[in-house]
Amino acid sequence: MLKGFKEFLSRGNIVDLAVAVVIGTAFTALVTRFTDSIITPLINRVGVNEQSDLGILKIGIGRGQSIDLNVLLSATINFILVAGVVYFLVVVPYNTLRKKGEVEQADDAQIVLLTEIRDLLAQTNSNSSGRHEAPGTAGTPPPNYGPRADT
C-alpha cells in the first residue's frame, strides 16, 4: 500500500503540479505585497484634497462610513498581474512545446506513410513484367465485349 502511494507521488504529473502550486502561491504573495505596498497607496492619493481624506475611489455614505473602491481596484490589478505572468511564463511556453511535439509526431507519421508507399512501389515494380495492371487483377483475362462495330 505504501509502495503504491510512493509510485503515485513520484509520477511526473503530480510532482509538476505540486511545484506549480508552491511557486504560484509564492508568486501570488509577492504580487499581493507589491499591490498592497505600492499600487494601493498611489490609488488612495488620487483625488484627495485638504478637506477630506476620501479620494475619488472612496465614496462617503455617512456616519464615518465609506465604500472603498480602492480595495476592489487593487484586487483587480493583483489578478491581472498574476494572470499575465502565469499566461506568459507558463501557458505560452507550454503551448509552444506542445505544438513542437505535435509537429515531430506528424513528421514521424509522414515518414512511416512514405516508407510504406516506397515499399509498395518497390513490390509492384518487382512483380511487374512490363504490363501494368490494377491491384488484384493479375492473371485475369480482359473482358470480351463481342465484335467491335468499326471493323
UniProtKB/Swiss-Prot annotation:
User: What compartments host this protein?
Assistant: Cell inner membrane
Q: Where are the transmembrane segments?
A: 12-32, 71-91
Subunit relationships: Homopentamer.
Membrane topology of this protein = Multi-pass membrane protein
Q: What is its main location?
A: membrane
Q: What is this protein called?
A: Large-conductance mechanosensitive channel
**Where are the annotated segments for Disordered?**
125-151
SUPFAM superfamilies, sorted: Gated mechanosensitive channel
Swiss-Prot/TrEMBL keywords: Cell inner membrane, Cell membrane, Ion channel, Ion transport, Membrane, Transmembrane, Transmembrane helix, Transport
Q: Which GO terms describe its molecular function?
A: mechanosensitive monoatomic ion channel activity
Output the Gene Ontology cellular-component terms.
plasma membrane
The family note in this entry says: Belongs to the MscL family.
Q: What does this protein do?
A: Channel that opens in response to stretch forces in the membrane lipid bilayer. May participate in the regulation of osmotic pressure changes within the cell.
As recorded in Swiss-Prot or TrEMBL, the protein's gene is named: mscL
